[in-house]
Amino acid sequence: MERYKLRQVIGEGASSTVYSGVSARGEEVAVKVVPRKGRSTGMVYREIEMLSTIKHENIVGIVGRFESKKHVYMVEELCDFNLVSFLNEYEVDEDVALKILRMILCGLRHIHSLGIIHRDLKLGNILLKGNTVKICDFGLSCYVEENNSEFCGTMDYLAPEVVDGKKYSFGVDMWSAGVVFYVLLTKKKFCESLDSLECSEELRDLLEKLLERDESKRADASEALMHRSFSRFIPRCEDFRGLPGFERGTKYGVLRKAGDSVELGSIRIDARRGKRHGGGRKHGDLGCLCGEEFTYSVYVDSEEIEPAFITNGQLKTLGLLTAHVKAMREKTPKIIIDDDGNKFYYMFSGGFVYVGKELTLRARGGKYEMSRRSGEKTYLEAVPDFLYEAIGGLEARCKAIDKEVCWFSRESPVLIDCSSHQQFSMSCISQVSEMSIRNRVEYDYIESTGWCIRDGLNFLFLMNDGEMFEVLCPDLAVRYRGRLLFIDDRLPMKLKRSLKGISPFLRSLCDGCYMS
């Protein structure tokens, strides 16, 4: 023991004593001291062997071992306290209890994948180091193929099959995890019933799956981690495929987007080919994003993993990565319209920035920030009345283009830069954006009126005054402001005026004399 100096006792068990200690290099550790007598020696050797094969953030790490004639010393990472002390010192709400349970389940999933049954999971054998849960004390643990279903563990945490002397497997750890979760929620001993438990239906459902008396029906660690209760902790990634590439260093590693992937440190997200809305493509190009639902795969150290199984430490990195993607979508313009010096930036997120001669208006999370040239800022619940018509028209134009156009460029944002309504042209889009448009669609500019997007016998009109409507010739109908109106209905006066304005254009199509 020349390398370590023992300090105070921090834990005692039936066959061992745990001390805090410090190495010659100043590293703080925990030292488990086990006398060489009875079964204790074999158990500690077994524990050292198991912990040496387990490398996981939710399992206490082994640093080394030493021996003397009378004792075996197992050196482990030092933690702050166990869950018994934690419960005595802090109030635990549902969110905190769920976070603790999730880390316990991550640890159990890992050891179960190695064929190890813990067999003595309880509050005293679950440690906290900072905000991270660590399962410890593998003295009663065994490999599943060597399991003889002996009676062992701590009475209050024993699964029914252990108490009844039946054969058992990994499910005993799941039952114990359920008991730990129950105690975290109630600070009471589990009494075989959930009738008096006051909690959300979601948590009750999770507990019922963990405390299922029939081991064959009891949730395993993977199934429990997939429970909807934990979805609140898993960050979702927004569609990054059209964003420009980026690369920068952070304290968590290199943050990078290249092609259909984003990554940070050991975490990578790959976009994958998903289903298309309506079941079909707008054209035959397999690289097109139009109508394709955004789905993705998550990788840790180049191995694909279900996001529900990602550890708490990895979730922090994943959260930073998805937050950066979201921020990039909010500040990267997809379409820019220059309207007589007033610029409208339509972002990948669906938000916008309107930069006028006297003010700037930003849409942020359903609210608006208006900044005047004087430096005065105002926060609003809605677009100001004096900008409502202009902003509404510009936003409608961008949404219509975003919906109808097939975007191919995924290495840089797709931008449209037009100096006025009259110069707002699809040739401008294709030149600036380097995109292609599906062959069966044609775009026509109607002098002093607006744009028409022709899709077969359907016509989408983007008017210069901001109005948008679709004429469905086969149905003799008009889609206007979310309603389907038939030509012989009583149409709104403004729509009637718009239809009257486009009638010469429609007649010219019928006569075959219109040149696009």
UniProtKB/Swiss-Prot annotation:
It is an enzyme of class 2 (transferase). GO terms for molecular function: ATP binding; protein serine kinase activity; protein serine/threonine kinase activity. Keywords: ATP-binding, Kinase, Nucleotide-binding, Serine/threonine-protein kinase, Transferase. ATP binds at residues 10-18, 32. It catalyses: L-seryl-[protein] + ATP = O-phospho-L-seryl-[protein] + ADP + H(+); L-threonyl-[protein] + ATP = O-phospho-L-threonyl-[protein] + ADP + H(+). Residues 4-230 form the Protein kinase domain. It holds the Pfam family Pkinase. The keyword Transmembrane does not apply. GO terms for cellular component: nucleus. Its EC number is 2.7.11.1. The keyword Nucleotide-binding applies. InterPro entries: Kinase-like_dom_sf, Prot_kinase_dom, Protein_kinase_ATP_BS, Ser/Thr_kinase_AS. The active site is at 120 (proton acceptor). PANTHER family: SERINE/THREONINE-PROTEIN KINASE PLK, SERINE_THREONINE-PROTEIN KINASE PLK4. Belongs to the protein kinase superfamily. CAMK Ser/Thr protein kinase family. This is Probable serine/threonine-protein kinase ECU02_0550. It comes from Encephalitozoon cuniculi (strain GB-M1). The lineage of its organism: Eukaryota, Fungi, Fungi incertae sedis, Microsporidia, Unikaryonidae.
